[in-house]
Regions:
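Glycine/Thr-rich phosphate-binding loops of Rossmann-like dinucleotide-binding domains
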Residues: 78, 184, 267
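Catalytic beta/alpha-barrel core
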Residues: 173-179
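Conserved phosphate-coordination/catalytic loops
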Residues: 47-51, 123-126, 153, 177, ...
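Alpha-helical scaffolding within the catalytic cores
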Residues: 127-132, 182-184, 212-217, 241-245, ...
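Acidic/histidine-rich catalytic cores of soluble enzymes
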Residues: 31, 36, 190-276
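Residues that line or immediately flank small-molecule/substrate-binding pockets and catalytic motifs
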Residues: 72, 150, 178, 254, ...
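Active-site-adjacent beta->alpha loops and helix N-cap segments on the catalytic face
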Residues: 179-189
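N-terminal pre-domain/capping segments
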Residues: 2-173, 191, 195-198, 203
Length: 284
């Protein structure tokens, strides 16, 4: 069995050869299109001020993945706080064990990084995103959706820029881990750009502002004809809902599924087949 990091190391070694061919990578199985959100490759090394598109393509090619939901940090310049060598631990706030609180200096630095990212998003031309898409196309990888987490610190200009990014990448779908209040702000931009936004849910159904319950998804769908659901069947099961029933009743509003196996009652992630929900029933 190979870990995500093992795949990354193999991909970096095999990348130039595998990227030399542009034939479409077929990662479908029995007619079901399988792919990945590129957040799954968050352990790849980062360099300050640089994207990691080339390393990501090498990893995807090594894994024979031909369909992706492109995670925004992969195509954005990495902040200094996210930089790590290949052998380091996870970046972007993914930590093992307890973390010490940030110092005032670290808080100030991260605030400056956040503002720099905002300005980069607003000012970067469409040609940059078109060039990124061309790299994936040349590698035989289809960009199905763009993943951008609309957080409360987004300005309206930054929200608008997010839709321009998606269009530059040639996609009409943004997948977003966001909140109900933010979805209300985002929906008018979805109407303006005619780009779909699929909200991603978690297992926290106690917070009325979070997506996770069928009722919360219904509220999103009512905001705009462009709002959709990106159903994570693991989180949905952990929140004690029936993923199979929801898919059957709402499939026309679901753009894609995130597949993981979890136990009910906010249980742990499990190896495929060991959780509460029978995964195969969700795509039959």
């Amino acid at each position: 069995m190979f870990s995500r990091r093992d795949f990354g190391r193999m991909a970096l070694a095999a990348g130039p050869l595998s990227m030399a061919f542009g034939a479409r990578i077929d990662s479908s199985v029995s007619g079901v299109q399988l792919g990945t959100i590129t957040y799954s490759f968050r352990d790849l090394p980062r360099t300050a001020g640089k994207d990691n598109v080339d390393d990501l393509i090498a990893a995807l090619t090594a894994c024979r993945i031909g369909e992706i939901e492109l995670y925004s940090p992969n195509i954005e310049p990495a902040p200094a706080s996210a930089v790590k060598p290949a052998a380091a631990g996870p970046a972007y706030g993914v930590a093992r064990g307890a973390r010490t609180p940030p110092t005032p200096e670290q808080i100030a630095a991260r605030k400056a990084e956040r503002e720099a990212l905002r300005q980069w998003r607003i000012s970067t031309p469409a040609s940059y995103y078109q060039a990124v898409r061309a790299k994936f196309d040349a590698a035989g990888i289809n960009v199905f959706a763009y993943t951008l987490g609309f957080n409360a610190d987004f300005t309206d200009d930054e929200i608008d820029a997010g839709f321009a990014q998606a269009k530059g990448l040639g996609v009409d779908l943004i997948a977003s881990s966001t909140t109900l209040p933010m979805a209300q702000r985002v929906a008018p931009f979805a109407d303006k750009h005619q780009v779909r936004v699929a909200v991603h849910g978690y297992a926290n159904v106690k917070d009325p502002n979070q997506f996770g319950s069928p009722e919360s998804f219904a509220k999103a769908l009512a905001m705009s004809k462009y709002m959709r659901v990106n159903l994570d069947i693991g989180h949905f099961t952990a929140a004690n809902y029936d993923a199979v029933a929801y898919v059957r009743e709402n499939h026309e509003h679901i753009t894609h599924l995130h597949i993981k196996d979890r136990k009910r009652n906010d249980g742990t992630n499990e190896p495929f087949g060991d959780g509460t929900r029978r995964l195969s029933r969700c795509w039959c």
